[in-house]
């Protein structure tokens, strides 16, 4: 990491970083270097093609990044500056990220769906010197207390400068945020090499090659979106297809049109695709691999999607902060693919914590809150905010889940540390409730949250979006019918919903995850 900046992180020591380089987990190659290599090796290949029909070959991408870098330098960008980017997913955002890197500056990535309150909080926390927006967000940015340029203004700027020196692979290159399912986000600090390690693992697990065609449908600035739309396509030299905003129909159409081989999505998006008639109307047979993660994967829609497309669904378990702890591979069985988060990754050391204080090592029991050290982790939160919560006392980075690890090293998520419904003194896993509820054919997406109860303290409330088959039929679903279905399947009575709320669309965070914080407020349990 940069020697002149104290990022205040216990994530790894200098000796550990040297080891990661020595064994090849980390690289001396930057993303900017990889773009230049692609411009030579795959000059005429499409690098990015977006929903507007705009696209750049790798040679054009490299040239565009250089042109934007000199204009950034002309606008005053200097090495070490923090440049915020509030921009829709398109070819332009990836060119801009590389141009900022070539100026030696640091990207502050902001989700396109973020509101001005969230943007203002990220700008203040990151101390960004400049905000660059697309035209759609430029007017909203006018009231923010930072110098602002639209991407069009930057591209048209006449003043040029000399950029650089560009960042190295161990330098901080990006600051993004937690995806904000509860409260305002915290800023997470990233080096390129943590994502280079993740990239190598994805290539091995999915048997990826430069000939693959990627379709990442997670917002670019967030962890899952970052490696699937930016770092891995660039390091591979493959083509990435970009959508402005996810819909099931648009995704299926893009797969068919571009003969996509690698789809990258959170499990909610995959479930929505299966519930949409578009998944049967378009030819999805080109798909070979689906990378998913971020939330528990419902078995039924996942198995149906594999049967429909012939693709294999691979899961990663981890977070924006920790990177990957476990993953499935093409060699795993169907049950391992769809029932677990995969086997613990050999290069990542993982321990389980529990006990009354949550700080007791309970790894031998096979169940607890995971924490890790290794080459995939971020540096944690900017300025060490909440590091006492993120890290254990001896420097292991925590996940916010409760997990089980079996004798073969496969990890399963049983719920979040804060995602339990405490009914009459019994902890009920919201993830287990959701997985059970999702077996009903009328339900496309479900989210379980606690609701207040004078007798039991909390009861199980489930919010659902209906599948297309339900909307074209009766158009609704009654609690009694859902409970009857679950009992017929033998679902434990403690997992039965006690309130069912059907809504058109579940609220989602900037990162695309279901915003349970909002649902808890709606249910009267904030």
Which functions belong to the PLM regions below?
Residues 1-56, 60-75, 485, 526:
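N-lobe entry segment of adenylate-forming
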Residues 260-265, 274-336, 349, 356:
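Gly/Ser/Thr-rich phosphate-binding loop
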Residues 131, 263, 318, 368, ...:
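AMP-binding/adenylate-forming catalytic core of the ANL superfamily
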Residues 55-59, 173-197:
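Conserved AMP-binding A3 loop
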Residues 43-44, 160-177, 184, 207-213:
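Conserved pre-ATP/AMP-binding loop-to-beta segment of ANL
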Residues 491-513:
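AMP-binding/adenylate-forming catalytic domain of the ANL superfamily
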Residues 196-213, 221-262, 276:
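Conserved AMP-binding/adenylation subdomain of ANL enzymes
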Residues 54, 69-114, 427:
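Conserved AMP-binding/adenylate-forming
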């Amino acid at each position: 990491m940069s020697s002149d900046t104290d990022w205040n992180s216990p994530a790894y020591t200098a000796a550990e970083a040297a080891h990661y380089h020595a064994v090849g987990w980390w690289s001396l190659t930057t993303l900017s270097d990889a773009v230049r290599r692609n411009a030579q090796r795959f000059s005429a290949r499409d690098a990015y093609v977006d929903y507007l029909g705009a696209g750049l070959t790798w040679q054009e991408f490299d040239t565009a990044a250089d042109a934007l870098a000199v204009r950034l330098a002309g606008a005053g960008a200097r090495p070490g500056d923090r440049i915020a980017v509030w921009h829709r997913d398109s070819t332009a955002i990836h060119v801009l990220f590389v141009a900022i890197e070539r100026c030696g500056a640091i990207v502050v990535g902001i989700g396109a769906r973020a509101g001005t309150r969230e943007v203002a909080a990220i700008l203040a926390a990151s101390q960004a010197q400049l905000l660059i927006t697309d035209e759609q967000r430029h007017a909203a940015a006018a009231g923010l207390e930072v110098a602002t340029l639209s991407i069009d203004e930057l591209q048209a700027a006449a003043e040029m400068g000399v950029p650089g020196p560009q960042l190295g692979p161990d330098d901080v290159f990006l600051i993004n945020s937690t995806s904000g399912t509860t409260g305002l986000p915290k800023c997470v600090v990233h080096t390129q090499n943590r994502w280079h390690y993740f990239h190598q693992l994805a290539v091995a697990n999915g048997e990826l090659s430069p000939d693959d065609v990627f379709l990442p449908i997670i917002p670019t600035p967030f962890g899952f979106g970052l490696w699937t739309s930016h770092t891995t396509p660039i390091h591979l030299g493959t083509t990435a297809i970009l959508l402005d905003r996810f819909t099931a129909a648009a995704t299926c159409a893009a797969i068919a049109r571009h003969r996509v081989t690698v789809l990258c999505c959170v499990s909610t998006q995959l479930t929505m695709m299966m519930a949409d008639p578009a998944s049967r109307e378009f030819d999805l047979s080109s798909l070979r691999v689906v990378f998913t993660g971020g939330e528990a994967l419902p078995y039924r829609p996942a198995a149906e999607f594999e049967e429909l497309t012939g693709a294999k669904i691979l899961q990663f378990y981890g977070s924006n902060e920790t990177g990957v702890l476990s993953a499935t591979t093409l060699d795993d069985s169907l049950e391992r693919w769809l029932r677990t988060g995969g086997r613990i990754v050999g290069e990542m050391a993982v321990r389980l914590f529990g006990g009354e204080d949550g700080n007791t090592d309970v790894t031998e029991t096979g169940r607890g809150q995971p924490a890790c050290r290794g080459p995939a982790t971020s540096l944690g939160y900017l300025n060490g905010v909440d590091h006492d919560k993120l890290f254990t006392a001896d420097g292991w980075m925590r996940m916010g889940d409760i997990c089980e690890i079996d004798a073969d090293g496969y990890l399963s998520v049983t719920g979040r540390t804060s995602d339990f419904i405490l009914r009459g003194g019994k902890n009920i896993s919201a993830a287990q409730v959701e997985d059970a509820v999702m077996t009903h054919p009328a339900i496309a997406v479900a989210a379980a949250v606690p609701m207040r109860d004078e007798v039991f303290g909390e009861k199980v409330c489930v919010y659902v979006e209906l599948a297309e088959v339900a909307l074209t039929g009766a158009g609704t679903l009654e609690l009694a019918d859902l409970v009857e279905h679950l009992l017929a399947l033998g679902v434990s009575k403690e997992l039965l919903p006690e309130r069912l709320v059907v809504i058109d669309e579940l609220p989602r965070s900037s990162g695309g995850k279901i915003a349970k914080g909002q649902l808890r407020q709606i249910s009267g349990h904030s």
